[in-house]
Protein backbone atom coordinates (compact mmCIF):
# COMPACT_ATOMS: atom_id res chain seq x y z
CA UNK A 1 0.00 0.00 0.00
CA UNK A 2 1.38 3.40 -0.96
CA UNK A 3 2.05 6.08 1.63
CA UNK A 4 -0.45 8.50 0.10
CA UNK A 5 -3.16 5.82 0.22
CA UNK A 6 -2.45 5.21 3.90
CA UNK A 7 -2.64 8.93 4.67
CA UNK A 8 -5.80 9.28 2.55
CA UNK A 9 -7.45 6.51 4.59
CA UNK A 10 -6.42 8.28 7.79
CA UNK A 11 -7.94 11.54 6.54
CA UNK A 12 -11.19 9.76 5.57
CA UNK A 13 -11.50 8.27 9.06
CA UNK A 14 -10.95 11.74 10.54
CA UNK A 15 -13.76 13.19 8.39
CA UNK A 16 -16.22 10.32 8.82
CA UNK A 17 -15.73 9.87 12.57
CA UNK A 18 -15.38 13.48 13.69
CA UNK A 19 -11.88 12.87 14.98
CA UNK A 20 -9.59 15.90 15.33
CA UNK A 21 -7.31 16.67 12.38
CA UNK A 22 -4.35 14.26 12.32
CA UNK A 23 -0.85 15.45 11.46
CA UNK A 24 2.50 13.87 10.74
CA UNK A 25 4.94 14.92 13.45
CA UNK A 26 8.39 13.97 14.74
CA UNK A 27 10.97 12.72 12.26
CA UNK A 28 9.22 13.12 8.90
CA UNK A 29 8.63 16.91 8.92
CA UNK A 30 11.97 17.47 10.69
CA UNK A 31 13.91 15.43 8.15
CA UNK A 32 11.98 17.08 5.31
CA UNK A 33 13.27 20.48 6.47
CA UNK A 34 16.79 19.07 6.84
CA UNK A 35 16.68 17.52 3.36
CA UNK A 36 17.29 14.04 4.77
CA UNK A 37 14.32 12.21 3.22
CA UNK A 38 15.66 10.40 0.17
CA UNK A 39 14.56 6.79 0.47
CA UNK A 40 11.21 5.28 1.34
CA UNK A 41 9.77 6.41 4.66
CA UNK A 42 9.65 3.53 7.14
CA UNK A 43 8.41 5.27 10.28
CA UNK A 44 5.49 7.68 10.75
CA UNK A 45 4.47 9.57 13.89
CA UNK A 46 0.84 10.72 14.02
CA UNK A 47 -0.84 13.13 16.43
CA UNK A 48 -4.21 14.85 16.73
CA UNK A 49 -3.14 16.78 19.80
CA UNK A 50 -5.96 15.36 21.92
CA UNK A 51 -7.44 12.10 23.21
CA UNK A 52 -9.14 11.37 19.87
CA UNK A 53 -5.79 9.98 18.69
CA UNK A 54 -6.69 6.72 20.45
CA UNK A 55 -9.93 6.43 18.45
CA UNK A 56 -8.02 7.16 15.25
CA UNK A 57 -5.51 4.40 16.01
CA UNK A 58 -8.30 1.90 16.70
CA UNK A 59 -10.43 2.73 13.65
CA UNK A 60 -7.40 2.93 11.37
CA UNK A 61 -6.27 -0.54 12.48
CA UNK A 62 -9.73 -1.99 11.87
CA UNK A 63 -10.13 -0.38 8.43
CA UNK A 64 -6.66 -1.29 7.21
CA UNK A 65 -6.94 -4.77 8.68
CA UNK A 66 -9.84 -5.53 6.33
CA UNK A 67 -7.51 -5.15 3.34
CA UNK A 68 -4.00 -5.98 4.58
CA UNK A 69 -2.18 -8.09 7.11
CA UNK A 70 -1.26 -5.73 9.93
CA UNK A 71 0.04 -5.91 13.48
CA UNK A 72 -1.22 -3.43 16.08
CA UNK A 73 0.40 -3.07 19.51
CA UNK A 74 -0.45 -0.96 22.54
CA UNK A 75 2.89 0.15 24.00
CA UNK A 76 3.78 0.66 27.66
CA UNK A 77 3.82 4.46 27.37
CA UNK A 78 0.28 4.54 25.96
CA UNK A 79 0.99 5.03 22.25
CA UNK A 80 -0.16 2.57 19.60
CA UNK A 81 2.13 1.14 16.92
CA UNK A 82 0.64 -0.27 13.72
CA UNK A 83 2.88 -2.29 11.40
CA UNK A 84 2.02 -2.57 7.70
CA UNK A 85 4.70 -4.41 5.75
CA UNK A 86 7.94 -2.48 6.34
CA UNK A 87 6.10 0.62 7.58
CA UNK A 88 5.60 1.41 11.26
CA UNK A 89 2.95 3.98 12.20
CA UNK A 90 3.09 5.35 15.75
CA UNK A 91 -0.04 7.04 17.07
CA UNK A 92 0.79 9.48 19.88
CA UNK A 93 0.12 8.62 23.52
CA UNK A 94 -1.24 12.18 23.92
CA UNK A 95 1.11 12.66 26.87
CA UNK A 96 0.94 16.01 28.66
CA UNK A 97 3.36 17.07 31.38
CA UNK A 98 1.58 17.68 34.70
CA UNK A 99 0.26 21.24 35.00
CA UNK A 100 0.93 21.85 31.29
CA UNK A 101 -1.74 24.55 31.12
CA UNK A 102 -0.27 26.52 34.03
CA UNK A 103 3.26 26.18 32.65
CA UNK A 104 2.22 27.45 29.22
CA UNK A 105 0.34 30.37 30.76
CA UNK A 106 3.61 31.41 32.40
CA UNK A 107 5.14 31.29 28.90
CA UNK A 108 2.54 33.78 27.68
CA UNK A 109 0.03 31.33 26.16
CA UNK A 110 -3.13 32.42 27.98
CA UNK A 111 -5.56 29.73 26.81
CA UNK A 112 -3.47 26.83 25.47
CA UNK A 113 -5.28 24.38 23.23
CA UNK A 114 -5.07 20.62 23.69
CA UNK A 115 -2.74 20.53 20.68
CA UNK A 116 -0.41 23.12 22.21
CA UNK A 117 -0.30 21.25 25.53
CA UNK A 118 0.56 18.00 23.73
CA UNK A 119 3.17 19.54 21.45
CA UNK A 120 4.97 21.44 24.21
CA UNK A 121 5.05 18.21 26.23
CA UNK A 122 7.16 16.56 23.51
CA UNK A 123 10.88 15.95 23.88
CA UNK A 124 12.73 18.39 21.61
CA UNK A 125 11.71 21.41 19.57
CA UNK A 126 12.95 19.80 16.35
CA UNK A 127 10.31 17.08 16.81
CA UNK A 128 7.32 19.40 17.23
CA UNK A 129 6.65 20.31 13.59
CA UNK A 130 3.28 19.26 12.13
CA UNK A 131 2.90 18.20 8.49
CA UNK A 132 -0.51 17.99 6.83
CA UNK A 133 -1.53 14.57 5.53
CA UNK A 134 -1.32 15.79 1.92
CA UNK A 135 2.41 16.40 2.63
CA UNK A 136 2.12 20.00 1.39
CA UNK A 137 2.37 22.17 4.51
CA UNK A 138 4.48 22.14 7.66
CA UNK A 139 3.41 24.08 10.76
CA UNK A 140 5.52 25.14 13.73
CA UNK A 141 3.11 25.40 16.70
CA UNK A 142 5.85 26.16 19.25
CA UNK A 143 7.54 28.72 16.97
CA UNK A 144 10.81 27.13 18.09
CA UNK A 145 11.05 24.18 15.72
CA UNK A 146 12.08 25.97 12.52
CA UNK A 147 14.70 28.25 14.17
CA UNK A 148 16.32 25.43 16.17
CA UNK A 149 16.47 23.11 13.16
CA UNK A 150 18.06 25.91 11.15
CA UNK A 151 20.63 26.46 13.93
CA UNK A 152 21.07 22.67 14.25
CA UNK A 153 20.67 22.70 18.00
CA UNK A 154 18.81 20.25 20.22
CA UNK A 155 16.59 22.00 22.77
CA UNK A 156 13.81 20.80 25.04
CA UNK A 157 10.36 22.28 24.44
CA UNK A 158 10.08 23.34 28.09
CA UNK A 159 12.69 23.68 30.82
CA UNK A 160 14.90 20.54 30.87
CA UNK A 161 13.85 19.97 34.48
CA UNK A 162 10.31 19.43 33.22
CA UNK A 163 10.90 17.72 29.88
CA UNK A 164 13.59 15.29 31.06
CA UNK A 165 12.43 14.72 34.63
CA UNK A 166 9.00 13.45 33.56
CA UNK A 167 10.46 11.09 30.95
CA UNK A 168 14.08 10.08 31.71
CA UNK A 169 14.20 7.95 28.52
CA UNK A 170 14.68 11.26 26.74
CA UNK A 171 18.13 11.72 28.28
CA UNK A 172 19.84 9.00 26.22
CA UNK A 173 17.93 10.29 23.19
CA UNK A 174 19.81 13.56 23.58
CA UNK A 175 22.98 11.67 22.65
CA UNK A 176 21.30 9.61 19.94
CA UNK A 177 19.49 12.45 18.16
CA UNK A 178 22.43 14.86 18.36
CA UNK A 179 24.68 12.17 16.86
CA UNK A 180 22.16 11.19 14.22
CA UNK A 181 21.37 14.74 13.10
CA UNK A 182 24.76 16.37 13.70
CA UNK A 183 23.17 18.83 16.15
CA UNK A 184 24.80 20.67 19.03
CA UNK A 185 23.07 20.35 22.39
CA UNK A 186 21.66 23.25 24.38
CA UNK A 187 24.02 23.98 27.33
CA UNK A 188 20.99 23.98 29.66
CA UNK A 189 20.38 20.31 28.80
CA UNK A 190 24.03 19.42 29.38
CA UNK A 191 24.03 21.22 32.74
CA UNK A 192 20.78 19.59 33.89
CA UNK A 193 21.87 16.07 32.96
CA UNK A 194 25.30 16.47 34.57
CA UNK A 195 23.58 17.50 37.83
CA UNK A 196 20.82 14.87 37.64
CA UNK A 197 22.53 11.91 36.03
CA UNK A 198 20.88 9.41 38.37
CA UNK A 199 17.71 9.89 36.33
CA UNK A 200 19.47 8.00 33.52
CA UNK A 201 19.34 4.85 35.66
CA UNK A 202 15.54 4.97 35.51
CA UNK A 203 15.78 3.77 31.89
CA UNK A 204 16.30 0.06 31.31
CA UNK A 205 19.83 -1.05 30.49
CA UNK A 206 18.58 -2.52 27.22
CA UNK A 207 17.04 0.79 26.15
CA UNK A 208 20.21 2.68 27.07
CA UNK A 209 22.45 0.20 25.25
CA UNK A 210 20.31 0.22 22.10
CA UNK A 211 20.28 4.01 21.81
CA UNK A 212 23.93 4.31 22.78
CA UNK A 213 25.02 1.87 20.07
CA UNK A 214 22.86 3.67 17.49
CA UNK A 215 24.42 6.99 18.48
CA UNK A 216 27.97 5.64 18.21
CA UNK A 217 27.20 4.18 14.79
CA UNK A 218 26.16 7.65 13.57
CA UNK A 219 28.82 9.93 15.06
CA UNK A 220 31.14 8.43 17.70
CA UNK A 221 32.99 11.71 18.26
CA UNK A 222 29.81 13.58 19.12
CA UNK A 223 28.51 10.71 21.24
CA UNK A 224 31.68 10.44 23.32
CA UNK A 225 31.91 14.22 23.61
CA UNK A 226 28.36 14.43 25.02
CA UNK A 227 28.89 11.51 27.41
CA UNK A 228 31.91 13.35 28.77
CA UNK A 229 30.23 16.76 28.93
CA UNK A 230 27.23 15.30 30.76
CA UNK A 231 29.45 13.26 33.09
CA UNK A 232 27.79 9.95 32.24
CA UNK A 233 30.75 7.56 32.05
CA UNK A 234 29.89 5.92 35.37
CA UNK A 235 26.16 5.83 34.61
CA UNK A 236 25.80 4.30 31.14
CA UNK A 237 26.27 0.60 30.31
CA UNK A 238 29.65 0.04 28.66
CA UNK A 239 28.64 -1.68 25.44
CA UNK A 240 31.07 -3.29 23.00
CA UNK A 241 30.94 -0.22 20.77
CA UNK A 242 31.61 2.15 23.70
CA UNK A 243 34.33 0.07 25.37
CA UNK A 244 37.32 1.28 23.29
CA UNK A 245 36.51 4.90 24.19
CA UNK A 246 35.90 3.96 27.82
CA UNK A 247 39.29 2.23 27.85
CA UNK A 248 40.94 5.41 26.62
CA UNK A 249 39.06 7.54 29.11
CA UNK A 250 39.69 5.31 32.10
CA UNK A 251 43.16 4.05 31.12
CA UNK A 252 42.12 0.46 31.81
CA UNK A 253 45.15 -1.75 32.28
CA UNK A 254 45.46 -4.33 29.54
CA UNK A 255 42.85 -2.72 27.30
CA UNK A 256 43.50 -2.97 23.59
CA UNK A 257 43.98 0.60 22.47
CA UNK A 258 43.73 1.80 18.92
CA UNK A 259 46.33 4.48 18.30
CA UNK A 260 44.22 6.26 15.69
CA UNK A 261 41.68 7.27 18.36
CA UNK A 262 43.72 10.13 19.77
CA UNK A 263 46.96 10.22 17.74
CA UNK A 264 49.10 10.17 20.85
CA UNK A 265 47.64 13.32 22.40
CA UNK A 266 45.10 11.79 24.78
CA UNK A 267 42.27 13.79 23.23
CA UNK A 268 39.54 11.44 24.37
CA UNK A 269 40.83 11.66 27.92
CA UNK A 270 40.38 15.46 27.92
CA UNK A 271 37.15 15.93 26.01
CA UNK A 272 35.66 18.11 28.71
CA UNK A 273 38.08 20.94 27.87
CA UNK A 274 36.62 21.38 24.36
CA UNK A 275 33.74 23.78 23.81
CA UNK A 276 32.29 21.82 20.89
CA UNK A 277 32.70 18.71 18.78
CA UNK A 278 33.99 20.92 15.96
CA UNK A 279 36.81 22.22 18.16
CA UNK A 280 37.71 18.66 19.14
CA UNK A 281 37.77 17.55 15.50
CA UNK A 282 39.95 20.50 14.47
CA UNK A 283 42.42 19.59 17.21
CA UNK A 284 42.39 15.94 16.15
CA UNK A 285 43.03 16.85 12.48
CA UNK A 286 45.89 19.08 13.57
CA UNK A 287 47.38 16.26 15.64
CA UNK A 288 46.92 13.81 12.81
CA UNK A 289 48.87 16.04 10.41
CA UNK A 290 51.52 16.57 13.05
CA UNK A 291 51.85 12.81 13.51
CA UNK A 292 52.08 12.23 9.75
CA UNK A 293 54.80 14.86 9.42
CA UNK A 294 56.79 13.15 12.16
CA UNK A 295 56.49 9.81 10.40
CA UNK A 296 57.53 11.40 7.12
CA UNK A 297 60.58 13.02 8.75
CA UNK A 298 61.56 9.70 10.31
CA UNK A 299 61.42 8.00 6.91
CA UNK A 300 63.54 10.71 5.33
CA UNK A 301 66.19 10.25 8.00
Locate the predicted segments by residue.
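Catalytic cores of the polymerase beta-like nucleotidyltransferase superfamily
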Residues: 1-301
